[in-house]
Amino acid sequence: MSLMNWIKNSAVILITCICICPSLRAAEECDKALPEYEAILKSGLKSGALYYNIANCYLEKGQVGKAILNYKRAMYFIPRDSAVRINYGYALSRTRQRDTTAKSPYFITLLNGAFNFFSLKETVLIFFICYFLAAALIIMKKFVKKHRFALGGLSILFIMATIMIAMPLSNKIKEAEKEAIIISGTTDARMEPASDATSLFPLYEGMKVYVIKSNEGWCKIKRPDNKTGWIAAKDLSMVTGPSTQF
């Protein structure tokens, strides 16, 4: 072996040790940590930080679907956490999915985007605050003679706010009840709940779907673009399943 080849081979070995070995150590640490995290969940303790750590472990192990699933769960607790959102975006970038979101009017998209920074509980709280303020102002307008014009204007403002908040709140409730993530590799949505049924379209690991109904180990799902099909229940996991209710 020539000196130059020896130097090249040594450099490759050195780079491999520097780049891959820490990754392997991290994966080994994740293998040890995951059972402990899962045990905490089974004990009934849930938090955004716990789901975030679980997601990071799955991401390190290359299980992108389960990573996205747990980042979504973390965002139910800590929707404004920048680390969760950055890692969630990175996990999405590692999937094969294409954008299947149905097009919505710009105003609706903007409104939903704004309320993505609030948890479901926070959105419900804001909705009821606006609702009760609107009701209180309407009652005050009937009994208070002074400033009726101002009270009427404020009541209209809070009524409009209540209606506007109702739209993203409805979407959040829908997602909390039906949202699921594909956790297997590529799977096919089928026309009927049977493995030999006609394949309709592929679903990739990490894709978001909505579960419409279940039937003996199969789930009828709907993509965000409203295409529907049947897949095996083992290929997906509900974001807010029985053990992850918020």
Model-derived segments and spans:
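Conserved beta-strand/loop element in small beta-rich adapter and peptidoglycan-binding domains
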Residues: T198-N215
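Boundary regions of SH3-family modules and the immediately adjacent low-complexity/disordered segments
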Residues: H147, G153-S184, M191-A194, T198, ...
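Membrane-embedded alpha-helical segments of integral membrane proteins
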Residues: A102-K141
